[in-house]
Swiss-Prot record:
The active site is at E171. It comes from the Eukaryota. N-glycosylated; high-mannose type. Pathway: Protein modification; protein glycosylation. Belongs to the GDA1/CD39 NTPase family. GO terms for molecular function: ADP phosphatase activity; CDP phosphatase activity; GDP phosphatase activity; IDP phosphatase activity; UDP phosphatase activity. Transmembrane segments: none annotated. This is Ectonucleoside triphosphate diphosphohydrolase 5. The gene is Entpd5. Its cofactor is Ca(2+); Mg(2+). Hydrolyzes nucleoside diphosphates with a preference for GDP, IDP and UDP compared to ADP and CDP. In the lumen of the endoplasmic reticulum, hydrolyzes UDP that acts as an end-product feedback inhibitor of the UDP-Glc:glycoprotein glucosyltransferases. UMP can be transported back by an UDP-sugar antiporter to the cytosol where it is consumed to regenerate UDP-glucose. Therefore, it positively regulates protein reglucosylation by clearing UDP from the ER lumen and by promoting the regeneration of UDP-glucose. CDD domains: ASKHA_NBD_NTPDase5 (cd24114). It is found in: Endoplasmic reticulum; Secreted.
Length: 427
């Protein structure tokens, strides 16, 4: 174990009264920079990390390349290779071996990306998020054990606890660290950080650095996480709302969450085309759904349905109303699909832009002919989540991004930092 790692990014999590505390002596971020301008010599100081993100709608692999250009100094983040498969592991709740095979498929990407000489010292880890949190514990563990066997039979380094379900708050914190690191907000003192909004299939996270003492005083217990970085202490507001992801919200809007069973029942909504009769599988369960054949249809009745899902159920910190946030995952996907932003480059939107597009789509459901039949519902839910859930103002600016400096946003990079440090891995 290289001694230069003994004091870098020591990430210690302790639950005290529901609060997550992070402690470090000297952060690894002080010496990690994107070095895309520097060519990589694989034989001289290059090493790798493999992080699997097992989400509710798909499983994603991130293969990170790091370069140690000078012995004894901290490494550079050279780049990332990303791939994914659908559906997510939770869809294989009753076929765990088949679920593990999807991970095996993605492991081939890592083999193709990493030189054989580096396999044995490259760690591989899978962290599952809300999709597996929603499953019965025994079934979730059975899935994870099958994945662990895949890892053990691979040529890569398999650390203890290589396969686990990640706490939602941890997910939000690591995403905030990743985005603020990639945007350069954590490289020096006195710079303003940005908040992060992550919308997955089963859960959603909000994380930001409060600037007002009032926010700290009024925040509910368990929503604050303290940690040290750059010899400064940060106290983040962070919370993960399980069941408020985009696809879980569809079930709530349809009334499927309260239903005793799904067989023979068609769930209907004003957010869907009147003529629609279809089926949808989520979390391994098949749902029949359709439009209101006789009832209302369009934005106003749809918005009333989705507002009931979030209203009064999320904490609304006043401070965020005028703050800037980075938003990704389904925020990005739905904005790109409806041409609110460029699919490759992303863009900046106001919260009200989601509502404008929702009205446009929902009030033209009769002419709907292609794309997702849930588009009206999804856009309306995103609008309600931002406005009625979190309490953002119409004019709040959101930076929608999938990548920063060609690196995927989300929690995976932050988690890989922690993984490599905890194992003491350098070149």
């Amino acid at each position: 174990m290289a001694t230069s790692w003994a004091s870098v990014f020591l990430l210690i999590i302790a639950y005290v009264g529901g609060t997550v505390f992070y402690r470090e002596q000297q952060t690894w971020f002080e010496g990690v920079f994107l070095s895309s301008m520097c060519p990589v010599n694989v034989s001289a100081g290059t090493f790798y990390g493999i992080m699997f993100d097992a989400g509710s709608t798909g499983t994603r692999i991130h293969v990170y390349t790091f370069v140690q250009r000078t012995s004894g100094q901290l490494p550079f983040l050279e780049g990332e290779i990303f791939d994914s498969v659908k559906p997510g592991l939770s869809a294989f709740v009753d076929q765990p071996k088949q679920g593990a095979e999807t991970v095996q498929e993605l492991l081939e990407v890592a083999k193709d990306s990493i030189p054989r000489s580096h396999w044995k010292r490259t760690p591989v880890v899978l962290k599952a998020t809300a999709g597996l949190r929603l499953l019965p514990e025994q079934k979730a563990q059975t899935l994870l054990l099958e994945v662990e066997e895949i890892f053990k039979n691979s040529p890569f380094l398999v650390p203890d606890d290589s396969v686990s379900i990640m706490d939602g708050s941890y997910e939000g914190i690591l995403a905030w660290v990743t985005v603020n690191f990639l945007t350069g907000q954590l490289h020096g003192r006195g710079q303003e950080t940005v908040g992060t909004l992550d919308l997955g299939g089963a859960s959603t996270q909000i994380t930001f650095l409060p600037q007002l003492e009032k926010t700290l005083e009024q925040t509910p217990k368990g929503y604050l996480a303290s940690f040290e970085m750059f010899n400064s202490t940060f106290k983040l507001y962070t919370h993960s709302y399980l069941g408020f992801g985009l696809k879980a919200a569809r079930l709530a809007t349809l009334g499927a969450l309260e239903a005793e069973g799904t067989d023979g029942h068609t769930f209907r909504s004003a957010c869907l085309p009147r003529w629609l009769e279809a089926e949808w599988i989520f979390g391994g369960v098949k749902y029949q759904y359709g439009g209101n054949q006789e009832g209302e249809m369009g934005f106003e009745p749809c918005y009333a349905e989705v507002r009931r899902v979030v209203q009064g159920k999320l904490h609304q910190p006043e401070e965020i109303r005028g703050s800037s946030f980075y938003a990704f995952s389904y925020y990005y996907d739905r904005a790109a699909e409806t041409h609110l932003i460029d699919y490759e480059k992303g863009g900046v939107l106001k919260v009200e832009d989601f509502e404008r597009k929702a009205r446009e789509v929902c009030d033209n459901l009769e002419s709907f002919s292609s794309g997702s039949p849930f588009l009206c519902m999804d856009l309306s839910y995103i609008t309600a989540l931002l406005k009625d859930g979190f309490g953002f103002e119409d004019g709040t600016l959101l930076q929608l991004t999938k990548k920063v400096n060609n690196i995927e946003t989300g929690w995976a990079l932050g988690a890989t930092f922690h993984l490599l440090q905890s194992l003491g891995i350098t070149s």
